[in-house]
Amino acid sequence: SNTLVYGHTCVMTDFETSVYKALAYLIESGHNQIGLLVGQETTADNRPLQTDPRYMSFKHYLEEKELYQPDYIRVGHFSSDSGYDMMKELIDELGNRLPSAFFMASDALAVGALRALQEASIPVPDRVSLISFNDTSIAKHVYPPLSTVTVYTEEMGKQAIHSLLQDLQRGDSGIPTMHTLATRLTIRESTR
């Protein structure tokens, strides 16, 4: 998360561009009804920390395109169980009005949602396309393999270590900086 506001250097993913690319791909593929499953990080006493930047980017982009539908959005936790529960709820509530595509804020959410869709005999990607976020190892090992936003976590770690070493060499923390890394949209079999 963005620690720059607290006076600390941070290394982040470019969430906004990442979400915009994923949504643009879905829209170009003919999807006009796009849902979102996202987690909410909380403190130890269950107070929300901040609104997830993927949610904010999703909302902003689809509002600009006049495609934003709040009924298609669920906020839970960043877990496969939460993804399963949220998708099951949407299937039960929306039935045939279920969106033709979903953006998932994490691979774990997508794995749970995929299971709920499969249990309801809703074919992916023929009826519902999915794009997730992170490209963890599980994304390519589920069926169908998940289209996902690839986050370069190893490079993020290298950038963080480099910044820390620079601070140590200077003997102070210097001026805090923010390093934002790009992502790549990796298309697999969960979208069409």
List PLM regions with ranges.
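Bacterial carbohydrate/catabolite-sensing allosteric modules
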Residues: 2-192
